[in-house]
């Protein structure tokens, strides 16, 4: 009995030391704790109460809607365990299958996304400082193989960190066996999730099939993988710092114009190792809310080191990457477009059948057509009697002309935009609105054609609005 008592106290002490060395917890912190009812999370809940840190714990149970026969019992159990340690409790339901079908995700990925979203919302709602989950050393090994099979690089294979922003994992140095022994010695029960035995989930197949097979070749496989992850983590830290240094030397933010641009100096960039170059490109894209694929990163690296001036690449998010003499420019000439369809050309041809508000996601804008003078900055007014629906909103064509109101005669649309200090690809932010008879009514957001102007004899007006939308 003495050995058992010493062992469970050793586990608690080990977690306390991890928190002291690796996590930013302070006495009195309010913490969201993810508690499923399984051995890991129940052990975490009880260990946290034994640390004498005066933590304010909120136990959050996530009902994924996948095991309706087991959920009520688990909720009741977790609520009781939370009450036993003086923690608040809340059960949150999420619709995993709806997200899975909508976004074409696996069940595991949809559940993970909704789970962490629910934790984040709970943290805001309770005013908590951190979110804590019960990932352990066995989870770390399984995650290594999941990421390996998905093609992760060094960063992914270095494993889950003890801290990732506001997310804390204090049990990563403990095995599943450690936690089960802790519960056994403390006389604490836990729930068994039947889905952990279902072979339809990748993590289960790795745990139940792949790992036992590999352990026939190396009985110390799990320790070997953890050591490898630790080595990769240290090397990852070094590479990340080196990439940051190259990033700082070779990039700058240009805030001139309507949208900020990131400019990459090709000479400074080309002096870096290829491994660092890839990281710099990835970092630029992530900071600009784009998720680059490996192919995107390779193409942009070649553009910076070998590409000719004026060559352009475009990511599906709307991020455009262009070589301009000695630099590569990353920007959103058309606003942030929430798609992930790979590199593509943006086209615009929108039929407008009458009054209304029309979302133009291609440009992150909305067009408003309404009777009367309307309200809002940048509204253009035209004579209603001269408007023939349906209208057409599209990009201007090469050489296309119109007669701007107030100008002595016709002018090329492109030249007019240049005179208005709208240059290059930014010109696509101002498409033309075409009347039913084929004439240009307006360059939306900027100017109307003279023949559509309001006069003293105008009986009714049409207001044309052009606003940026939020994403």
UniProtKB/Swiss-Prot annotation:
Keywords of the record: ATP-binding, Cytoplasm, Ligase, Nucleotide-binding, tRNA processing
Known catalytic reactions: cytidine(34) in tRNA(Ile2) + L-lysine + ATP = lysidine(34) in tRNA(Ile2) + AMP + diphosphate + H(+)
GO cellular component, one term: cytoplasm
Principal place of residence: cytoplasm
Molecular-function GO terms, alphabetical: ATP binding; tRNA(Ile)-lysidine synthase activity
Listed EC numbers: 6.3.4.19
Classification via InterPro entries: Lysidine-tRNA-synth_C, Rossmann-like_a/b/a_fold, TilS/TtcA_N, tRNA_Ile_lys_synt, tRNA_Ile_lys_synt_N, tRNA_Ile_lys_synt_subst-bd
One Pfam family here: TilS
Residues engaged in binding ATP: 36-41
GO BP terms: tRNA modification
Major enzyme class: ligase
Subcellular location(s) of the protein: Cytoplasm
Comment, domains: The N-terminal region contains the highly conserved SGGXDS motif, predicted to be a P-loop motif involved in ATP binding.
Role, per record: Ligates lysine onto the cytidine present at position 34 of the AUA codon-specific tRNA(Ile) that contains the anticodon CAU, in an ATP-dependent manner. Cytidine is converted to lysidine, thus changing the amino acid specificity of the tRNA from methionine to isoleucine.
Family membership: Belongs to the tRNA(Ile)-lysidine synthase family.
NCBIfam families: lysidine_TilS_C, lysidine_TilS_N
Protein name: tRNA(Ile)-lysidine synthase
Organism of derivation: Desulfotalea psychrophila (strain LSv54 / DSM 12343)
